[in-house]
Amino acid sequence: MTTIKTSNLGFPRLGRTREWKKAIESYWAKKISKEELDQTLTDLHKENLLLQKYYHLDSIPVGDFSLYDHILDTSLLFNIIPERFQGRTIDDDLLFDIARGNKDHVASALIKWFNTNYHYIVPEWDNVEPKVSRNVLLDRFKYAQSLNVNAHPVIVGPITFVKLSKGGHQTFEEKVKTLLPLYKEVFESLIDAGAEYIQVDEPILVTDDSESYENITREAYDYFEKAGVAKKLVIQTYFERAHLKFLSSLPVGGLGLDFVHDNGYNLKQIEAGDFDKSKTLYAGIIDGRNVWASDIEAKKVLIDKLLAHTNELVIQPSSSLLHVPVSLDDETLDTSVGEGLSFATEKLDELDALRRLLNQNDSVKYDKLKARYERFQNQSFKNLDYDFESVRTSRQSPFAQRIEQQQKRLNLPDLPTTTIGSFPQSREVRKYRADWKNKRITDEAYETFLKNEIARWIKIQEDIGLDVLVHGEFERNDMVEFFGEKLQGFLVTKFGWVQSYGSRAVKPPIIYGDVKWTAPLTVDETVYAQSLTDKPVKGMLTGPVTILNWSFERVDLPRKVVQDQIALAINEEVLALEAAGIKVIQVDEPALREGLPLRSEYHEQYLKDAVLSFKLATSSVRDETQIHTHMCYSQFGQIIHAIHDLDADVISIETSRSHGDLIKDFEDINYDLGIGLGVYDIHSPRIPTKEEITTAINRSLQQIDRSLFWVNPDCGLKTRKEEEVKDALTVLVNAVKAKRQE
């Protein structure tokens, strides 16, 4: 009988109570020393390693832990340093500056990691001299060994790393070949240090165009075979199905496949005999991206099927557990829903239950998890009926007619200025909200504070000279969690944090039941803000696609049904804002692109559903009401027509870190709706110059009709300091005023 082994691809960095985030931000704020930061993070890394050891994993990942981002770690490992940051010592301070920018230089681009809500720092190849320069991976592997942890190093593979990079004069293939000797050097150092195998993450090999670079992939791994290291390599793929016959032909020791998000294709390939039995199969059977407990009995059935076609089997999560919270231990959840949940720690417990059952015939833990899952499944969370057909899915009039009525009503100047929505969440704001939630202050005291903060920022915006204002969202902890707290069908946790980018953590709500709007969500704050000014104040909402993509979704209904339920709820709030006299309503969809399936065969339906849901949420308003939306930067070329089909009167897009790349996406489309391309990077504390903003405006106007163009920051300003926001917006408005005189 084959012995089943267990492993993991990666563990959350944040810590149970976001210790990682707090330590790093304290260091940035100069509240703790570098030595204190190092000690805190070392302690957290140790805790993560020993926790995984407690659940009897046969091999534990090292290299998943990072001070910011594992792709940026790889860039520094190979001396792929942006040209503007070259010449400095390669250390943690350089890492932070590349990621965040500084007073002299802009940060590197920040892009979604495949179709997740994690973001990576894009490697830049302009004028670089690749070499092994900072082997932190080796240091962390040796540290794990010192703890008597059976660890395996983790590194993003050469094909994926280069494919996610930008810049440089070399071709894709030339860049890969440049890195191969460096990867070999790193692999040899790890093997010499005692690594039994090395996890090489190549998720790019599950994407549509992977077949177009199969030749360079084969050349790369043949190179490693000739170097004598290939048999120690395990290629891990995740998020979709892989081309198994090709992967099996590579001279590596093992292959990792996703058996959760592959739509059943990977098992079909296994059963068709496409897997080379001389290799070890690393089977991703536990969902690494959602928080629902596994159907443990179904997982056992899957394992039995895989055992019939493999000689060595390791079971693992479908992807790194970076995408889920750390533990349920500190949560106080209603049992009816709580029994159906599984965070990172509980997923390790599921693996351990299967290992015990299959290797030791010990069914105690397995039976407990099976009974718990069955109790959850026996409940019904499908209780509501919906009338989707009675709600409009297109505006009353075309944009050309609407914009005339809107401009007459709003009377906006040339190149109107606005912000994306949120203003700084100061320590005082967070304290008041926490005190209110914990009932340490009265509703009246909290409402008074919010009104004072709204009034203060309305005046700040008027003094700066912005044209369309916002109330600042001080009552909101997160643009999705806020709606999760107020809409029926959502569950919000206390400690369910996950990393989005750098030290930015979000707490996705959990959709467990039918979604319904029961009362106004944002009307009071928005109407109050509008009462303080003659300038228009935007109502600020999050769109249905983003709410779904940034939540942990229920799995007992099709995505489209849940998405449309959310759209109906948002439509109710849009109409409530309009009825209250709000003239401009923004429905943000920053996550529309990130949810795009990795395989193009699913793109058309996804985009069709997304557009319909957005229009379901926004089309019932009158022509004179202006609908805005906002999206975060990504590769928009694939969805540019869908963006147009949303029929939003104005869209603002995060673009500054793309350094002009995004504008190319508008060359092939006559974009005839209002648009604002973000003119400065809000993810960096750096204040833009007037010249930089003017350059960004001029570059945008080469492709976009001036009468349709808006000027705005990249994104919401929640994470910035007040003085940074004031200074940056003042520069923005002054640049626009000068441009209006030309």
UniProtKB/Swiss-Prot annotation:
The keyword Metal-binding applies. 5-methyltetrahydropteroyltri-L-glutamate binds at R18, E19, W20, K21, K112, W550, E594. Pathway: Amino-acid biosynthesis; L-methionine biosynthesis via de novo pathway; L-methionine from L-homocysteine (MetE route): step 1/1. Binds 1 zinc ion per subunit. Keywords: Amino-acid biosynthesis, Metal-binding, Methionine biosynthesis, Methyltransferase, Repeat, Transferase, Zinc. It catalyses: 5-methyltetrahydropteroyltri-L-glutamate + L-homocysteine = tetrahydropteroyltri-L-glutamate + L-methionine. Its EC number is 2.1.1.14. GO terms for molecular function: 5-methyltetrahydropteroyltriglutamate-homocysteine S-methyltransferase activity; zinc ion binding. L-methionine binds at I420, G421, S422, E473, D588. Transmembrane segments: none annotated. Its cofactor is Zn(2+). GO terms for biological process: methionine biosynthetic process; methylation. It is an enzyme of class 2 (transferase). L-homocysteine binds at I420, G421, S422, E473, D588. Zn(2+) binds at H630, C632, E654, C715. The active site is at H683 (proton donor). The keyword Zinc applies. NCBIfam families: met_syn_B12ind (TIGR01371), PRK05222.1 (NF003556). Catalyzes the transfer of a methyl group from 5-methyltetrahydrofolate to homocysteine resulting in methionine formation. Belongs to the vitamin-B12 independent methionine synthase family. This is 5-methyltetrahydropteroyltriglutamate--homocysteine methyltransferase. It comes from Staphylococcus aureus (strain JH9).
